[in-house]
Amino acid sequence: MTSYAPGMLKGLIDSTPDTAVLINLAEHYAGRQLPATGVDSQVVYDCPRTQVMVRTAVKGTTIGTHFHTVCDEIVVAVGGRGEILVNGQWKPVKAGDVHVCPRGIVHDTRALEEDLQYLSIFTPHLPAGTDINWL
């Protein structure tokens, strides 16, 4: 098997960043200090095309109904339980569930009974100043 060093394959239209990322979610979550309320969020991958955040909605948190005009959001539940507003209806989510929300679609996330751990993947990247339009 051939191995390639970071940055070896150049000449792409957009080749930033020039290194890959591997995240151990168990270690990540174990090392985070959660707020008493709200959402803990850390950007773990950032490029012009995509942004990935590892997040925890703390028990009792409702993010708030909103939509995005520029980017689509993919939410991957990786731990705990919660609910996501999908097409106007609250749906239960647990580890292994994936919610794909195109731009312009109203959605929300809440963690009522326990913390909800999830990934948010935005494509394209969230613009400067954010793309959250609250309702």
Locate each region found by the language model:
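A short, N-terminal "cap"/entry segment at the start of jelly-roll beta-barrel domains
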Residues: 1-51, 64, 134-135
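Short, charged/polar surface micro-motifs in flexible loops or helix N-caps
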Residues: 48-50, 58-61, 81, 90, ...
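Short, conserved beta-strand element in jelly-roll/cupin
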Residues: 56-58, 67-84
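Structural motif
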Residues: 81-83, 90, 106, 115
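Short acidic-glycine-tyrosine-enriched beta hairpin
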Residues: 88-103
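Ligand-binding loop in jelly-roll beta-barrel domains
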Residues: 103-129
